[in-house]
Amino acid sequence: MRNIRLYTLLALLLMAGGVMQAQITCWDGSVAEAYAGGDGTTGNPYQIATAEQLALLAQQTNTGSGGNACYILTDSICLNGSEGYSWQPIGTEEYAFTGCFDGNQFTIKDMYITNAGFSGLFGNTLNATVRNVRVTEAMDNNVNPQGADGLVVGKATNTNIINCVSMGLMNGIASKQGGIVGHFIVDTPEADTIFLKDCVNHVNLYGMLYAGGIAGYSEITNGVMSIEHCVNLGNITNGVMCGGIVGAGSFSIRYCDNYGMVSSNSISGGIVGQRDDFGEIVFCTNHDKASIQGEIAGGIAGAARQTKIAMCANRAKVTAQGDSNDWICAGGIAGADGKISNCYNRGDVECLVLYGQPEVVQMGGITGTGGNVVNVYNTGAIIPPENPHTNNAWYGIIAAGLSDDPTVDNWYWFGEYDINPYGFDWPYYLVPGSCAFNEGASATTWILDEAQYGTTDLTEALNLGAMNECIWKEDEDLTNDGFPVFGAMPPVGLAEQETQLFDVYPNPTNGILFVETRRATSLPAANEYRITNLLGQTLQSGRVGGEMHQIDVSGLPSGMYLLNLDGATVKFVVK
């Protein structure tokens, strides 16, 4: 049975014609006297049907006379998008939004921001919930070097942000900049978990200090933060610490994907730029065209510190570049540090010395310099600089440098290399249970040069090394060029409960989506399916039946969609 990651990736919906079915009247700059209905309770939230009523929420919140109830959009809104109609974000430093807001899958378009303390649809939220918000065609020109910018929320404290989408331009200046939220803070009793989940960013970011596709900077004082099922599609450049999902901070990140290029002046990672302390990054992927570049650069994390990185994959090129006195590190999974297990790298790892004499150059297929590295494989090439201009230059197929007393085991690499295949720890030493592998008898089998755990099959050896026979599986669908992929991944996305009754693959797809039942019996022959965009509009429907069925989705534009079938819903992406 195929357990496929059922979520996100590539361009969303609003690119398709006819997304807005009705003509929307844009904001005239005024403020409504009342909401369209409701009493502000959870069961009967205030109804917001016009831009003027949304401006009423901003006015009440920012003057301390409201913003502490529940609100719901009942129609799409246009905020005019011009200099004469600059949006004042909901919530200020003095008066935060403390209620619950449901965008109800409607769109808020043409938001224009020029002068705000915290920039976004919401400026500052506290103990709040923001969900189902679609910000599109936004223009953020706010300049506040000490501030926080996010198209959905600027600064969010103890705020659950769920199922939000950002599209537009962020041309402003802020120290913390994220496509969804600029500064994400958790300060609650330890039993509480705050979620940032099911969000997608399309915005290109030009960071000043911290920049992330989903969150610029995340911070935990007390409590638990979980960032999960999020996708970044925007490119991120210029910041000091940049990541496809989070620029830097404290967090737990699970089931996230990056498709955007990440380039910084210092530390870059496909998922995270820098982790401040202990944490975890699991079941995350940096995809093919999402190249990573920085002085310290990693396909998953730039500077991982004590972070656990497990079941993660990088498929893009990683380039570390620097000049005089720089410490240059590059790794397919982590540029530096981290506790890495059950991961693989498919991207080339390159180092460029721009000029002068760097202090250190370290390059590895998994990590430039790290702590624990266990049960991993690398197929990417290691491309050293033509002249490192330093005697402190080390290269490794898996790791160039290791910390004191590391845990290392089961390193596998594809083909033959001229560089040293062993771990470097002053001096080089042979890592236990490690060797090269080459092609087997089929496109999905790979043979170890030396038997490990009594087998020469790479996939079997990886599972034995993981002490779990389900973590790795053969790439039956050839989505990874036949190299082993992760197998036992819990169902994710909208249908993540044990009751999910079907799988879809490949995901993303180029045109044909296969549907396979998890039932003990086949699907009913006349079971109806429905494909919608994220606004809930039906784009395609039909009937499927049997143990396996295929649906032709080649007529859909590139983007993310929902497949509704047999009482469950899963996300899939068309490339």
What are the functions of these language-model segments?
Residues 12, 63, 356, 476, ...:
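Generic marker of residues within folded, mature protein domains
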